[in-house]
Amino acid sequence: MKFLLAFSLLIPSVVFASSSKFQQVEQDVKAIEVSLSARIGVSVLDTQNGEYWDYNGNQRFPLTSTFKTIACAKLLYDAEQGKVNPNSTVEIKKADLVTYSPVIEKQVGQAITLDDACFATMTTSDNTAANIILSAVGGPKGVTDFLRQIGDKETRLDRIEPDLNEGKLGDLRDTTTPKAIASTLNKFLFGSALSEMNQKKLESWMVNNQVTGNLLRSVLPAGWNIADRSGAGGFGARSITAVVWSEHQAPIIVSIYLAQTQASMEERNDAIVKIGHSIFDVYTSQSR
């Protein structure tokens, strides 16, 4: 993590990568699109030199649970502004429980701090915890306004869990683009959107994610580190946003989004693994 923090003040101008460098990645993504009859978007941003590559980077995809990083970043930002106390507590009511809440469902009748709610939703993808955070930061509109404030004109949140995961084709609600989300993560972790202390906290939540072991983490090169957040939704939506780095490799921000496919969850997970492996090959082959 020390290596990651060393780049916390660096946001280089974007430089488009040569098409030849990512030629194999593009071929692999296209092949997966065909095999799954899916729509796929990918972006890769090297934070050291600003080198950027994408595939369908400006197309819209359902945010699904990748929004949780943004919601928790908003909580951290609001705490810096004195608008909210992350140590304040919220009573957990049975009526507030929504589907997939592995942490919160065991704490009905108890109180949870906003900080702990972020830890729960970032590390287990607990949906009720996410709604608790949304309530504290002004709801979906508060999140979207925050995104506009930091310069993200594309990403938008319109609903809460679980409705935001609907994923209908052509529905602009609760969507992002691979390019926009990569830029926003760059601002959260390496820019001035958050203090260094809160950059470290957000990174720690992503590093400690417990539900992505079968995705990019399964093909992470030896000696590399990862901080990530995944998501899934209707109409074949599956996604992951991640930062990967090593002692010799500056942080790389990767976003992968799948949509409009009838592929099984296992097939969609495998698609993310294959795309991630192809991306990692670009960087590991350079150091051989």
UniProtKB/Swiss-Prot annotation:
Active-site positions on this chain: S65
UniProt: substrate binding residues: R229, S230, G231
Reaction(s) this enzyme catalyzes, per UniProt: a beta-lactam + H2O = a substituted beta-amino acid
E.C. no: 3.5.2.6
A Pfam family reported for this protein in Swiss-Prot or TrEMBL: Beta-lactamase2
A GO BP entry: beta-lactam antibiotic catabolic process
GO molecular function terms noted in the UniProt entry: beta-lactamase activity
Further comment found in the protein's record: The class A beta-lactamase family has a specific amino-acid numbering system, sometimes called Ambler or ABL numbering and often misspelt as Amber. A multiple sequence alignment was used to derive a consensus sequence and then the consensus was numbered taking into account insertions and deletions. This allows use of identical numbers, e.g. for active site residues, despite differences in protein length. UniProt always uses natural numbering of residues, hence there appear to be differences in numbering between this entry and some papers.
InterPro entries: Beta-lactam/transpept-like, Beta-lactam_cat, Beta-lactam_class-A, Beta-lactam_class-A_AS
Name of the gene: pse4
Coiled coil: none
Job of this protein: Hydrolyzes both carbenicillin and oxacillin.
UniProt name for this protein: Beta-lactamase PSE-4
Lineage of source species: Bacteria, Pseudomonadati, Pseudomonadota, Gammaproteobacteria, Pseudomonadales
